Amino acid sequence: MIEIDGSYGEGGGQVVRTAVALSAVTGKDVKVTNIRKNRPNPGLKQQHLKALETAARICEARVSGLFPGSSELFFSPVEIKGGKYEVDIGTAGSITLLLQSLMPALPFAKEKVKLTIKGGTDVAWSPTIDYLQHVTLRALEQLGYAGIVTLKKRGYYPRGGGEVSAVFEPCKLRSFHFRRVKENRRTGEARREEETRNEGRNQNQRIEIQGISHASNLPAHVPARQAEAAESLLLEAGYGSRTKIQSFELLSTGSGITLWSGYCGGSALGKKGLPAEKVGRRAAEEIILELSSKAPVDVHLADQLIPYMALAGNSSYTVRELTLHAATNIWVTEQFLDVKFRIEEKEGLFEVSVD
């Protein structure tokens, strides 16, 4: 049995998500203690419980410690099976974080897994659904990952009501290397995309950033102003952009914007009292920071790629900063798999690799 101290490093829900996913893949029992110990509301929350319940259903696991506020979890998987599953997180629990708990395990399922999930699609402290679709899954395609996530309806805090459908096929993960083009080691589509992006940094107007600006129960000018502010700042930095505008009438009032280019993204959520222009600029500033660093992946994707790297083997990427989230994910992954990550600083960036 693997024992994981849930307070290690970043000490948040990601420790549990990665531990459970890798437990399912390896078939090793896991006990996680001190879950979210240093958080204002420690222990498991509703969205964690739903993720764990779903993981247990998919891999026929025995589980103990599944209750709100639980600081300890035992998870004993049997086999990752396929099938159809419906999950209602309740309120605005993050759909993307629930998927993060499952996705590393699903290539190893016996057959196709189909999910219908209700909850929050654009909520604080989690990737937006647009980021998952256009950055995370796009990068995972380079590993041979076979997954499609479809947005049916957005859900905002506090009532949620969003809906996403997802289909994941069993597949064999292949090694990947997301590096600067000057290292000249990449091949295929991913290399061509990186060449385009890196050449464009000398002439930023050649990089086109795409985005979606959206709002619910607000005047149509709100998502338009978010987009205009983002595009204006991007233009000042020399980047071309195209942003779709979406307006809805849903359960909760909310807004947000997600921008992406290659394997880098930027996003921001609106809130009461925060001008739409500030929301747009925050997303633009985030992606400009990533693109200007010349790193092929952004700091959030770098965190998410860790378990896939270990499962694929012989993989690497370069990122502008190694976050505590990523370092914690590395530690958890090394507890389950016979791998050792290496981190090297090169020309102001960090190369993370695993054999």
From Swiss-Prot:
EC number(s) reported in the record: 6.5.1.4
Subcellular localization is given as: Cytoplasm
Q: Which PROSITE patterns match?
A: RTC
Pfam families the UniProt entry points to: RTC (PF01137), RTC_insert (PF05189)
Write down the superkingdom of origin: Archaea
What's in the GO CC field? cytoplasm
Q: Which reaction does it catalyse?
A: a 3'-end 3'-phospho-ribonucleotide-RNA + ATP = a 3'-end 2',3'-cyclophospho-ribonucleotide-RNA + AMP + diphosphate
Q: Which residues form the active site?
A: H325 (tele-amp-histidine intermediate)
Protein name per its UniProtKB record: RNA 3'-terminal phosphate cyclase
According to its UniProt entry, this protein's organism is Methanosarcina acetivorans (strain ATCC 35395 / DSM 2834 / JCM 12185 / C2A)
Q: Which GO terms describe its molecular function?
A: ATP binding; RNA-3'-phosphate cyclase activity
Q: Which family does it belong to?
A: Belongs to the RNA 3'-terminal cyclase family. Type 1 subfamily.
For this UniProt record, the keywords arranged alphabetically read as follows:
ATP-binding, Cytoplasm, Ligase, Nucleotide-binding
Q: Name one GO biological process term.
A: RNA processing
Q: Which CDD domains match?
A: RNA_Cyclase_Class_II (cd00874)
User: Where does this protein hold ATP?
Assistant: Q100, H300, L301, A302, D303, Q304
**Its function?**
Catalyzes the conversion of 3'-phosphate to a 2',3'-cyclic phosphodiester at the end of RNA. The mechanism of action of the enzyme occurs in 3 steps: (A) adenylation of the enzyme by ATP; (B) transfer of adenylate to an RNA-N3'P to produce RNA-N3'PP5'A; (C) and attack of the adjacent 2'-hydroxyl on the 3'-phosphorus in the diester linkage to produce the cyclic end product. The biological role of this enzyme is unknown but it is likely to function in some aspects of cellular RNA processing.
